[in-house]
Regions:
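Conserved glycine-rich Rossmann-like NAD(P)H-binding loop of the short-chain dehydrogenase/reductase
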Residues: 29-45
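Short, small/polar-rich loop/turn modules that mediate ligand/substrate recognition or access, typified
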Residues: 87, 173, 178, 234-236
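Substrate-binding pocket helix/loop in short-chain dehydrogenase/reductase
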Residues: 97-98, 105-110, 204
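Active-site helix of classical SDR
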Residues: 121, 157, 165
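Alpha-helical segment proximal to the catalytic Tyr-Lys
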Residues: 126, 170-171, 232
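Residue(s) in the substrate-gating loop at a strand-loop-helix junction
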Residues: 141
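C-terminal helical subdomain
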Residues: 181, 202-234, 241-243
Length: 262
């Protein structure tokens, strides 16, 4: 068992992307990290690449499966002795017009994106309560704060997660457990680079005051801040890490282009 002086984070969806960036930042800050993902082979390769066997643990599990969640959380507790932070990052998306989304697709997205964080928190919170507190960060999305096309299931699941965050904060605060959410805007992940054409990226840039995509490490910085002592009086908040995307409203590309050309 690792020293109890080391803080421990459990990060879901940790095999790649924002989850991996958060796990990396925790390790850089001296934490031990249990990394959970449904992509077992990718996860194990990622964990092996750290070459930090004493500080890392790979947990293959589906966050929508109650039994798998309980088993994974118990394995993390046995390995490290405690869990100080939970990052509910695992998520999936279906991008289709509303009338084309099937019931099965709708249910699967909500199962992973909303029920998953519920199950993970139900499993981890008693451990945090018994050790005197902890921090939970749910990864929602700008799509949960403002409607958009082609993401009825995804956006609805993330809006629900934003409210779940506040509900958890209201009820778990008495145990010293803080619960917040990070709502990413467009992020320069490998997936985004694969599916966002130059035209799509230009459209996003026009609506983002900082005129660029966010970086995975910038999301990790926000996550780790909310899990740390400097955020000790912050709970029940949804922090948009989006370059101003949510604040800006509708872009006016023609006016902006004319101004730039003056």
């Amino acid at each position: 068992m690792a020293s109890e002086l080391k803080k421990v984070a459990l990060v879901t969806g940790a095999a790649r992307g924002i989850g991996l960036a958060a796990a990396t930042r925790f390790l850089d800050d001296g934490w031990h990290v249990a990394m959970l993902d449904i992509l077992g082979d990718t996860l194990r390769s990622t964990v092996n690449a750290f070459d930090r066997a004493e500080a890392t643990l790979a947990l293959e599990a589906d966050v929508s499966d109650p039994g798998a969640v309980q088993a994974a959380v118990e394995q993390a507790r046995r390995q490290f002795g405690r869990i100080d932070a939970l990052v509910n990052n695992a998520g999936i998306a279906v991008f289709k017009p509303l009338l084309d989304v099937t019931l099965e697709e709708w249910q699967r997205v909500l199962a992973v994106n909303l029920t998953g964080p519920f199950l993970m928190t139900q499993a981890v919170a008693p451990i945090m309560r018994d050790q005197g507190g902890g921090a939970i960060v749910n990864i929602t999305s700008i799509s949960g704060l403002r409607a958009s096309t082609l993401r009825v299931a995804y956006g609805t699941s993330k809006a629900g997660l934003a409210h779940l965050t506040k509900q958890q904060a209201a009820e778990l605060g008495e145990y010293g457990i803080r619960v917040n959410a990070v709502a990413p805007g467009p992020v320069d992940t490998a997936m985004a680079r694969d599916v966002h054409t130059p035209e799509i990226r230009a459209d996003y840039h026009d609506h983002i005051p900082l005129n660029r995509y966010g970086l995975e490490r910038e999301l990790a910085n926000a996550i780790c801040f909310l899990c740390g002592d400097q955020a000790g009086y912050i709970t029940g908040q949804v922090l948009a890490v989006d370059g101003g995307f949510d604040a800006a409203g509708v872009g006016l590309p023609t006016l902006r282009n004319e101004r730039r050309n003056q």
